Amino acid sequence: MTTTSRAEQRSNLFRFIQAVFNPLSKTILRSPLHGVMSRKLLLITFTGRKSGKELTTPISYVRQGDTLLLAVGGSWWKNLRGGATVWLRLQGKQRTAVTEVVTDEEAMSEVYQIILAQNPTQGRFMGIKASPDGKPNTNDLRQAIERGTAVVKVHLKAGVAIQ
């Protein structure tokens, strides 16, 4: 009998969620029923760095004024490096934005403190718990970084909404 590590379990869960939840989320977030999900989820559309194809994925976010904070895993976020322009379906409206990828541990810790305070589920999904002082657990954060987790700051372009 083989045992499965927590990292493998998390990876398997992530793949399951992508396969089942993502298509359903895309449909709902594009529909008039988006309100049931759009307070915490958005659709982000970007261009693949290798394929050149337009790709769309649902993702959880925390809003800080005109900046959205995304905790991201996997490798798709690498498409967002270098100030990529992205298109969002945010609370039923199309918006354009520019990305800023954060991979530095100290900067990620600051952002995760905000994420954990506003949406603890997002942190748990990435395997990062809050310490008693509200900051992310240092070991959890380091392990997440080793797994390829990053933070993406999505800066909304002022006055640019696409209907």
Language-model regions, residue ranges each:
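Short, structured beta-strand-loop surface elements
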Residues: A7-E8, G74-I162
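Short hydrophobic/aromatic-rich motifs at helix boundaries and adjacent loops
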Residues: M1-T2, F14-I17, T47-R49, G83-A84
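Alpha-helical membrane-targeting segments
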Residues: T3-L41, T121-G134, R142-G148
